[in-house]
């Protein structure tokens, strides 16, 4: 692992330019002859705006403190839209929680390979449900599971969603979100988005059967719709789901009577009619191999799973990590983690944290702040810079999630 430390204690929030108090004094004749000169004063606003749009997103906030003119430029709606259109795209960041009972932590920028001190809006503890898409991040509490917030963690803008329908108390819940990427050039800041909730609850007195319901929130109508009410036999829902190309994928887990430990359900959100039962298992997709756990993610509208590969004789014991892409109903292997990286985590449990977007996958062990990245295009594994989060006691857990840093999108 690379041991170089690289982080900045830089709290993220919009920075408002406050002009310093001017100092008045008499100038000498020599001083009066010298005039201050700034190169950017020669540039028209549109050209300066274009130059600033090539800065990394972390530098945009610092640019706003240079002078009033720069602050007005980087705060304008036109600049925010142009910045998001810039060919020098921002890669997804990874947020790592500092402690289990605090929403603060550090965010990692893989382009300049630096960590930033970062506070999240809305969320209270690290065990909340998290889902992200196109700059927006959804948070849902892990207790009552009825407090849902949608936010832009960079600008700190957020809103509260109304309580979803269905069982008030569930055994398992999976949340995902998707921002409508169609017509991106038009009204980028107010693009519509959806939030899905998959609820799973055991049928009273029957461990073999589980009630499962799917609920979808639309930001356009600001309402929830119940899409599916079904009863699964021998399977239950879990906490893993994602939306790709308007198809909701979520993992299900065997409760006995199946050769598969895990499975995948695909539900087309645009073709589901009135809530009905018996339809979910028709779209069952088996896992690529025996997995200890699986993490679903949307990478450029492709469904990707990062899974722990179990031993042949002991499938619950992890021996490696693989990455697959779903094509139709078949899994195509993209990569397997080299053993030197797998062993670099130290002790690796059968379950772990992994998330990704664009073409970048993050993998993190719950027992260590070490963070590994995998570039899907370059097929390249790389450790992140050392995170400033340190392990303070043996049973301390580490977790996090990735999101796209965007300035222009609002919940």
From Swiss-Prot:
Pathway entry: Protein modification; protein ubiquitination
Domain F-box: 37-83
InterPro entries reported in the protein's UniProt record: At3g26010-like_b-prop, F-box-like_dom_sf, F-box_dom, FBXO31/39, Kelch-typ_b-propeller, Kelch_2
Keywords, ordered alphabetically: Kelch repeat, Repeat, Ubl conjugation pathway
Keyword Zinc-finger: no
Kelch repeats: from-to residues: 81-135, 137-178, 196-246, 251-299, 302-350, 352-401
Domain of life: Eukaryota
SMART domains membership: FBOX
Any one Gene Ontology molecular-function term assigned to this protein's record: ubiquitin-protein transferase activity
Alphabetical list of Pfam families matching this protein: b-prop_At3g26010-like, F-box, Kelch_2
GO BP of this protein: miRNA-mediated post-transcriptional gene silencing; plant organ development; protein ubiquitination
Quaternary structure annotation from Swiss-Prot or TrEMBL: Part of a SCF (ASK-cullin-F-box) protein ligase complex. Interacts with SKP1A/ASK1, SKP1B/ASK2, ASK3, ASK9, ASK11, ASK12, ASK13, ASK14, ASK16 and ASK18.
PANTHER family, per the entry: F-BOX FAMILY PROTEIN (PTHR10706), F-BOX ONLY PROTEIN 31 (PTHR10706:SF130)
Function: Component of SCF(ASK-cullin-F-box) E3 ubiquitin ligase complexes, which may mediate the ubiquitination and subsequent proteasomal degradation of target proteins.
Domain remark in the UniProt entry: The F-box is necessary for the interaction with ASK proteins.
Protein name: F-box/kelch-repeat protein At3g61590
Organism: Arabidopsis thaliana
């Amino acid at each position: 692992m690379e041991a170089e430390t690289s982080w900045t204690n830089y709290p993220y929030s919009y920075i408002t330019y406050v002009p310093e108090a001017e100092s008045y004094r008499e100038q000498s004749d020599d001083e009066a002859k010298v005039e201050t000169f700034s190169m950017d004063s020669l540039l028209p606003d549109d050209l300066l705006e274009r130059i600033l749009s090539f800065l990394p997103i972390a530098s945009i906030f610092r640019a706003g403190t240079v002078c009033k003119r720069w602050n007005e430029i980087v705060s304008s709606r036109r600049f925010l839209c142009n910045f998001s259109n810039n060919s020098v795209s921002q890669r997804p960041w990874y947020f790592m929680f500092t402690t289990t009972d605090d929403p603060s932590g550090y965010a990692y920028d893989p382009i300049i390979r630096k960590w930033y001190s970062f506070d999240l809006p809305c969320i209270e503890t690290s065990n909340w449900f998290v889902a992200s898409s196109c700059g927006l991040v959804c948070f849902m509490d892990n207790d009552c599971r009825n407090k849902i917030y949608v936010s832009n963690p960079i600008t700190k803008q957020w809103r509260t969603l109304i309580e979803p329908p269905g069982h008030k108390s569930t055994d398992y819940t999976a949340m995902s979100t998707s921002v409508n990427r169609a017509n991106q050039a038009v009204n980028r800041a107010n693009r519509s988005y959806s939030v899905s909730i998959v609820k799973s609850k055991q049928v009273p007195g029957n461990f073999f059967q589980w009630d499962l319901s799917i609920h979808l929130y639309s930001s356009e109508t600001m309402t929830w719709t119940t899409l599916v009410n079904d009863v699964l036999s021998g399977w239950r829902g879990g906490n893993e789901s994602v939306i790709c190309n308007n198809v909701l994928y979520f993992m299900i887990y065997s409760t006995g009577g199946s050769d598969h430990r895990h499975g995948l359900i695909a539900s087309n959100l645009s073709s589901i009619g009135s809530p009905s039962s018996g339809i979910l298992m028709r779209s069952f997709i088996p896992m690529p191999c025996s997995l200890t756990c699986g993490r679903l993610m949307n990478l450029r509208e492709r469904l990707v799973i990062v899974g722990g590969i179990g031993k042949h004789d002991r499938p619950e014991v992890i021996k490696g990590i693989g990455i697959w892409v779903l094509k139709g109903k078949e899994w195509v292997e993209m990569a397997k983690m080299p053993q030197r990286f797998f062993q670099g985590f130290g002790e690796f449990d059968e379950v772990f944290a992994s998330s990704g977007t664009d073409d970048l996958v993050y993998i993190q062990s719950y027992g260590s702040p070490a963070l590994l990245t995998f570039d899907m295009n370059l097929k390249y594994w790389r450790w992140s810079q050392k995170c400033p989060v340190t392990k303070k006691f043996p049973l301390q857990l580490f977790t996090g999630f990735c999101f796209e840093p965007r300035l222009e999108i609002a919940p």
